[in-house]
Amino acid sequence: MRPALSDYQHLASGKVRELYRVDDRHLLFVATDRISAYDFILDSEIPDKGRVLTAMSVFFFGLVDSPNHLAGPPDDERIPEEVLGRALVVRQLDMLPVEAVARGYLTGSGLIDYQKTGSVCGIPLPSGLVEASKFDEPLFTPATKADLGEHDVNITYDDVVELIGAERAEQLRERTLAVYQQGADHALSNGIIVADTKFEFGIDADGELTLADEVFTPDSSRYWRADDYAEGQVQNSFDKQFVRNWLTGPDSGWDRNGDQAPPPLPPDIVAATRARYIEAYERISGLRFDDWIGGAA
């Protein structure tokens, strides 16, 4: 018989996830259907989103060459029935205070940095790059981990060295870029470009750098259709950027620079976001989302 969620001590709430203690060495990592944008948790939820994030992470944890925090399968008997398919039992780690971002293309905050300084996170780039320009080699562009409601801030590699030391910083950069390349190559073979992605790493009890949190999900990555990619324009995306674009477009009536929270998403945007997340999972993994555990009976 599976435990109830109430049997576990609740430790923390994030923008999307809930964290519970299983025992002295393990945590329950639960992905909800919440969606955040521009550091706000939106009033609207995206049905099945937490299951997609979990399914995608499990797929990529198995694909890439890095130790990870998983401590059991998706149907681990320690996972309560009520969160089956959207929860994982993971090892407790000493998390690094750095968001490990890898970028293969110029977009988002990287584009803003480049337009202001000609660099991204202190890395000088050639002149003449535009929205969606592909880099010659992927970049490691770290950021600070912000508290809930605060903005992550891009930092330089030297800042990372100050935070975690030179040896660990070099290991983090090499691992981030290697994992990104593996995932991006796999996605591209299935017609999807991973423009950029964000990883989190921790240190396990043996001192090993360990991949944690979520991996290559539509929340943590920018996914573009490879068949209609074109430099110099906003791309057709499978990820949370679709929601961001609606919020900053004319239909939402929301001023990003004001002090009001974003409005709820209309039903058609909710449905389209759900469809994009599921399509990303199915195209990249080659699996049917309907076969993932925890769905309606």
Curated annotation (Swiss-Prot):
Entry keyword Ligase: yes
Gene Ontology molecular-function annotations: ATP binding; phosphoribosylaminoimidazolesuccinocarboxamide synthase activity
Enzyme class: ligase
Reaction catalyzed: 5-amino-1-(5-phospho-D-ribosyl)imidazole-4-carboxylate + L-aspartate + ATP = (2S)-2-[5-amino-1-(5-phospho-beta-D-ribosyl)imidazole-4-carboxamido]succinate + ADP + phosphate + 2 H(+)
The EC number(s) this enzyme carries: 6.3.2.6
Entry superkingdom: Bacteria
UniProt keyword annotations, A-Z: ATP-binding, Ligase, Nucleotide-binding, Purine biosynthesis
The protein's annotated pathway: Purine metabolism; IMP biosynthesis via de novo pathway; 5-amino-1-(5-phospho-D-ribosyl)imidazole-4-carboxamide from 5-amino-1-(5-phospho-D-ribosyl)imidazole-4-carboxylate: step 1/2
Gene3D superfamilies in the cross-refs: ATP-grasp fold, B domain (3.30.470.20), Phosphorylase Kinase, domain 1 (3.30.200.20)
Listed GO biological process terms: 'de novo' IMP biosynthetic process
A Pfam family of this chain: SAICAR_synt
Keyword Ligase listed: yes
A single GO cellular-component term on record: cytoplasm
SUPFAM superfamilies: SAICAR synthase-like (SSF56104)
Family: Belongs to the SAICAR synthetase family.
NCBIfam families registered for this protein in UniProt: PRK13961.1, purC
Annotated protein name in UniProt: Phosphoribosylaminoimidazole-succinocarboxamide synthase
Gene that encodes it: purC
